[in-house]
Amino acid sequence: ADGYARATGRVGVCLVTSGPGATNTVTGIATAYLDSVPLVVFTGQVPTALIGNDAFQEVDIIGITRPCTKHSYLVKDVADMPRVIKEAFYLARTGRPGPVVVDLPKDVIQATTEFRYPKKVELKGYRPTTEAHLGQVQRAYQLLSRAKRPVIIAGGGVVTSGASEEL
């Protein structure tokens, strides 16, 4: 999923089983977080009634990955799936890209619902910055235009965002 996202610029997706399947994704999720790679990771989970009861292969993947994801969801109602999936992909690719975990209990996966995506994503408090601060850009320009031997060290985000030529 990480390689796909890096190669295409699109959101990478993976689906893993509960327990060890979920925990084996942690290094990849952390790498994607540090490198700003957009991922949506779907993890299996024990049925909702067994969460918190130390069930076989129950893992708190939300808690484990909290420090290295943009957001995590534990879907407890199948009716929430369209909204959660739409939000997960939106969050993974907007602002600074990064991984989002969607934890899916077995009973939720087995349930059925009418699947209609919401037309738009409405997340309270989430306002990704999409434009540079004009004052900072002007200051950088002034410093670079006066420099005798300027050096710019730019991260991979320049390539990912397609701004190489502009830089």
Regions found by a protein language model. Give the residues of each.
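N-terminal alpha/beta PP-like core and its mobile active-site loop of ThDP/TPP-dependent enzymes
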Residues: 1-167
